[in-house]
Amino acid sequence: MKTSVFVLVLGLVLLFAVSFATEMEESARECGKFMWKCKNSNDCCKDLVCSSRWKWCVLASPF
C-alpha cells in the first residue's frame, strides 16, 4: 500500500515537472540575439535577420 501511494505521488510530481517545463519553454521565448541560431527572421530581435546560409541572427545588410 505504501509503495503504490509513493509511486502515485512520484508520478504526479513528474507529470507536474514536465508540464511546467513545457509551459516555461513556450512562454519564455526571447528574440534571437546576434549570432543565435534561428529558423527564420521572426526568431531574431529587431534590426537582425536570419542568415539564409548559416541560420544565425545577423545584422541586416543596408544593401
From Swiss-Prot:
InterPro entries referenced in this protein's UniProt entry, alphabetically: Huwentoxin-1 (IPR011696), Huwentoxin_CS1 (IPR013140)
Function recorded in the entry: Inhibits sodium channels Nav1.7/SCN9A and potassium channels Kv11.1/KCNH2. Also binds the voltage-sensor domain of the potassium channel KvAP (from the archaeon Aeropyrum pernix) with very slow apparent binding kinetics and affects channel gating. Reaches its target by dynamically partitioning into anionic or zwitterionic headgroup lipid membranes. May bind to the open state of KvAP.
Anything else known: Negative results: does not inhibit potassium channels Kv1.1/KCNA1 (IC(50)>200 uM), Kv1.4/KCNA4 (IC(50)>200 uM), Kv11.2/KCNH6 (IC(50)=45 uM) and Kv11.3/KCNH7 (IC(50)=55 uM) and sodium channels Nav1.1/SCN1A, Nav1.2/SCN2A, Nav1.3/SCN3A, Nav1.4/SCN4A, Nav1.5/SCN5A, Nav1.6/SCN8A.
PROSITE patterns: HWTX_1 (PS60021)
Taxonomic lineage from the root: Eukaryota, Metazoa, Ecdysozoa, Arthropoda, Chelicerata
Main location class: secreted
Signal peptide coordinates: 1-21
Tissue expression from the record: Expressed by the venom gland.
Protein name: Kappa-theraphotoxin-Gr3a
Cystines in this chain: C31-C45, C38-C50, C44-C57
GO molecular function annotation: ion channel inhibitor activity; potassium channel regulator activity; sodium channel regulator activity; toxin activity
Localization of this protein: Secreted
Recorded family membership: Belongs to the neurotoxin 10 (Hwtx-1) family. 63 (VsTx1) subfamily.
Proregion span(s): 22-29
Domain topic, free-text comment: The presence of a 'disulfide through disulfide knot' structurally defines this protein as a knottin.
An example Gene Ontology CC term for this record: extracellular region
Record keywords, A-Z: Disulfide bond, Ion channel impairing toxin, Knottin, Neurotoxin, Potassium channel impairing toxin, Secreted, Signal, Toxin, Voltage-gated potassium channel impairing toxin, Voltage-gated sodium channel impairing toxin
Organism encoding this protein: Grammostola rosea (Chilean rose tarantula)
